[in-house]
A protein has these predicted regions:
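General "foldedness" signal
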Residues: 14, 33-35, 50-52, 57-63, ...
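Aromatic- and glycine-enriched beta-alpha-beta binding-site module
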Residues: 3-65
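Short, charge-rich amphipathic segments
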Residues: 1-7, 30, 66-84, 131-135
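Long, solvent-exposed, polar/charged low-complexity segments
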Residues: 85-162
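Generic detector of bulky aromatic hydrophobic side chains
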Residues: 25, 70-71, 136, 143
């Protein structure tokens, strides 16, 4: 821990808390996980990959092409908008999208990395006893998406070990 009395700006060394819920012994870079972050001036939570996970997202792209209705069904069952959950992350700029990919799945198809995050979080919720319930409901809402992606990550790990 840093002694702030010797710094010019007196800022704390650690100004936020980051919790991630992922499988034990799984490398962070390849991991799909839920997270919760609390900072001095922000708070958020969601689901996603730590970094770009090209193999897993390539599998998602193949699934979108092969079974768009199944992927849409999973996303619809999450009711992301109803829970104020929003897709974020970066997208490929020049990745060709097959004509068979429906318009509503194109952002998912083009994802280079992604996360689904709660938006509209108010800072005062950090002091509200309903916070745990809010986070739990959002995590449960994202569970179908987690299961879809988790299956893909597990398949990749099994393939790489074989």
């Amino acid at each position: 821990r840093r002694a702030t009395r010797f710094t010019k700006d007196k800022s704390p060394y650690r100004d936020h808390l980051w919790l991630s819920f992922r499988r034990a012994a799984e490398p962070r870079d390849a991991s799909l996980f839920y997270w919760f972050e609390l900072g001095i001036d922000h708070m958020n939570w969601g689901l996603g990959f730590w970094n770009e996970n090209r193999p897993a997202l390539d599998m998602l792209r193949r699934r979108i092409v092969a079974s768009p209705d199944q992927v849409r069904g999973v996303l619809d069952s999450c009711k992301l908008a109803e829970h104020h959950l929003l897709l974020g992350g970066s997208q490929f700029k020049r990745l060709p999208v097959p004509d068979t990919v429906p318009e509503d799945l194109r952002p998912w198809y083009l994802a280079k990395d992604f996360y689904v995050q709660r938006f509209g979080v108010r800072q005062e919720w950090a002091f509200d006893d309903k916070l745990v319930g809010r986070v739990r409901r959002d995590f449960q809402a994202m569970a179908p998406l987690y299961r879809l992606l988790r299956g893909m990550v597990d398949d990749l790990q099994e393939t790489s070990q074989a």
